From Swiss-Prot:
Keywords: Heme, Iron, Lipid metabolism, Membrane, Metal-binding, Oxidoreductase, Sphingolipid metabolism, Transmembrane, Transmembrane helix. This is Delta 8-(E)-sphingolipid desaturase. The keyword Heme applies. Disruption phenotype: Leads to increased resistance to cell-wall-damaging agents, such as calcofluor white (CFW) and Congo red (CR). Accumulates C8-saturated and unmethylated glucosylceramides. Displays growth and conidiation defects as well as and raft mislocalization. Its main location: membrane. One of its GO terms (molecular function) is oxidoreductase activity, acting on paired donors, with oxidation of a pair of donors resulting in the reduction of molecular oxygen to two molecules of water. Residues 97-124 are annotated as: Disordered. A motif (Histidine box-2) lies at residues 286-290. Belongs to the fatty acid desaturase type 1 family. The histidine box domains may contain the active site and/or be involved in metal ion binding. One of its GO terms (cellular component) is membrane. It is found in: Membrane.
């Protein structure tokens, strides 16, 4: 294994050793890619790559990248594999790997590498075949992002985790290799059918209609601003921002022109120049979300401590691999989570202000790529942020509105009107599964298990902006949103053929599901609080160190 060509067959044991040495190895279409030299150039950030180390990332790569980008990836090929690949748990998620010894017996090493990947949670023996199991060995840990809390937790938390896994494994197709391979095959066949039917082709007339709608809202906002009807003007400005987000989302997924740089420019003009939000921040976060959807330790889209928690696992002081910090379940979060089902909508009214903070943190700290094709995006975005605060902060708020009371009213009304988009974003995932079924679960099954769609009439599609088809979007992110309704019929066939449940709720029922989930977690917080009080009174943890 010391020297090999790009087409040389590499053993599982050798690949494991490379990962143990800190290399970033991923599998793509039976090719072994070593992407260490590319990771700092990756436009989507380094985290999304780190979550794919040691895994067959074929479906994730195909879903999120253009044909041209996939072709460029082949430059990092160092070999091939033969036969189906059994995924490792990535180092960033707590995976452990053994260093490679060229003098060791290769056959023995390969077979020993077939054991189940380790789990940072627990050994779910009773859940179902194929669920992650821990195995002990003399492995070297590359990265172990475990909880920093040593405080013991009540047993009901682990019992709840097991219960959720049991429920999901009973509801969804088996996690055995044959079943999951069949799901992958059908998913890839469906992609070919989608391509053949032209559903990846953008309908530019639909975007002309969108542009007319944006212009109408912006024009009405300006009209009423000049009349001095500041509150009405603020409402239409909020509608303008609400609708703009959907096209920025499309551009971020390269779903408009399918050209990376062109769509990036479109997205930055919309998000930064017109909306004051960083497209780069959103892409970095969103790409990770698309790969580790609804995983409490890894998905930034559900990491809203101390205000919201959609899983009891947030009670365990989880360490976020995205933010590289511990999400503490402290006294403040304990209080907030007990009432989160009541505070959900009020807090979302102020959601846009938090996006400003995250955007500036991303740009000031330079968290995006500084090299490669996206090196200049940061500076273009900063220019966009300056432009936004000149036209909105100075031109609208300061120069066009005479009193501070009216200015504050305009500011809050315009921002609160955008709250529905925060509801639409959280609606797709907050009520769905957060159970960890292991690294052998196929990409399409995981996306459908963790994502909800909204059933709405066609005439209301403009209001949801494609977010009503989030499950379908997660399967095929680069499909232009105006084609998602047609794609839905094909995905329904796929779900019937594979036996994967398709979660579809009306907007009202979906909101009820979300509030119900938040209320359930709030109830668990109260139970945990009672457990702690009881244990403290009985001195159960008095000898714990």
């Amino acid at each position: 294994m010391a020297s090999h060509t790009k087409d040389a067959l590499l053993s599982r044991r050798y690949i494991e050793g490379q990962i143990a040495a800190g290399k970033h190895i991923i599998i793509f279409d039976d090719r072994v890619l070593k992407v260490d030299s590319w990771i700092k150039f990756h436009p989507g950030g380094d985290k999304s790559i780190k979550h794919m180390v040691g895994q067959d990332a074929t479906d994730e790569i195909n879903a999120l990248h253009s044909v041209e980008a996939r072709q460029r990836m082949l430059a990092f090929q160092i070999g091939r594999i033969q036969g189906p690949w059994v995924n490792f748990l990535p180092p960033i998620q707590g995976g452990k790997f053994r260093h490679y010894d060229e003098n060791a017996d290769s056959e023995e090493d390969d077979t020993s590498g077939q054991s189940q990947p380790p789990s940072p949670i627990f050994d779910a023996v009773d859940a179902a075949p194929g669920v992650r199991r821990q195995y002990a060995s003399s492995e070297t840990s590359v990265s172990t992002p475990a909880s920093e809390s040593s405080e013991p937790k009540p047993f009901f938390l682990d019992a709840r985790t097991r219960e959720e896994i049991v429920l999901d494994t009973a509801k969804y197709p088996s996690l055995d290799a044959k079943t999951q391979q069949d799901i992958k095959r059908r998913y890839r066949e469906l992609n070919k059918r989608i391509e053949a039917e032209g559903l990846y082709d953008c309908n530019y007339f639909s975007y002309f209609i969108e542009a007319c709608r944006y212009t109408l809202f912006a024009g009405l906002s300006y009209f009423f601003l000049r009349l001095g009807w500041y509150s009405v003007s603020a409402v239409f400005l909020g509608c303008f921002w609400h609708q703009l987000v959907f096209s920025a989302h499309d551009a971020g997924h390269i779903a408009i022109t399918h050209n990376y740089q062109v769509d990036s420019i479109i997205g930055i003009l919309i998000a930064d120049f017109l909306g004051g939000l960083s497209l780069g921040w959103w892409k970095r976060s969103h790409n990770v979300h698309h790969i580790v959807t609804n995983e409490p330790e890894h998905d930034p889209d559900i990491e809203h401590m101390p205000f919201f928690a959609i899983s009891h696992r947030f009670f365990m002081n989880l360490r976020s691999t995205y933010y590289d910090r511990v999400m503490y379940f402290d006294a403040f979060s304990n209080f907030m989570l007990k009432y989160q089902h009541y505070l959900y909508y009020p807090i979302l009214l102020f959601g846009r202000f938090n996006l400003y903070r995250l955007s500036w943190e991303y740009l000031i700290l330079g968290q995006g790529p500084r090299k490669g094709p996206a090196w200049w995006h940061r500076w273009f975005e900063i220019a966009g942020q300056i432009f936004f605060w000149i036209w909105f902060g100075y031109g609208v708020l300061y120069c066009s509105i005479p009193t501070w009371g009216s200015r504050l009213s305009f500011l809050f009304i315009s921002h609160m009107v955008t709250a529905p988009v925060h509801v639409q974003i959280t609606l797709s995932h907050f009520a769905m599964s957060t159970a960890d079924l292991g690294v052998q679960e196929s990409f399409p099954q995981k996306m459908l298990r963790t994502t909800m769609d909204v059933d709405c009439p066609t005439w209301l599609d403009f209001f949801h902006g494609g977010l009503q088809f989030q499950a379908i979007h997660h399967l095929y992110p680069r499909i232009p949103r105006h084609n998602l309704r047609r794609t839905q019929k094909l995905v329904l066939e796929f779900c019937r053929d594979t036996g994967i449940p398709y979660a579809l709720f009306t907007f009202t029922d979906g909101n009820k599901e979300v509030i119900g989930r938040l209320g359930d977690i709030a109830k668990q917080v109260r139970i945990l609080e009672e457990c702690r009080k009881s244990c403290a009174q009985q001195g159960v943890f008095s000898n714990h160190h």
